[in-house]
Amino acid sequence: MIQIRELLNETSPNNFTPEHLCALHEQVFSKVYPWAGKFRKVDIAKGDTLFLKHQQIASELKILFSNLANANFLKNTTPTEFSEAIGNFIIHLNLIHPFREGNGRIQRLLVWQIAKNAGLTLDWQSV
């Protein structure tokens, strides 16, 4: 399993897509889960939260990442604007919950990359 720290040190991509999200998941979890990097094929819930039906994952991620691209991947935003926009992005991505396991770790890694690409630094300690 590749260490997330190693990925944090890599250059962030300029383009974020559902395929990039899958690639991150596969890089991190390929030695743990045989389905790493692939969208879940079952419906799941955590507590009282029912996540998006698995048949809708690909289409909803396409919309979510298209909206991010239309916002120029949040480049040239103030820290406040970035926080609000990325907060909404995380809410939607979490409700989609594309993978059976590892969603939170991959979300944080992706958000860190988006922030880095936008010229910002995240401090997860203060979140």
Indicate residue ranges for each PLM-predicted region.
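FIC/Doc superfamily catalytic core
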Residues: 1-127
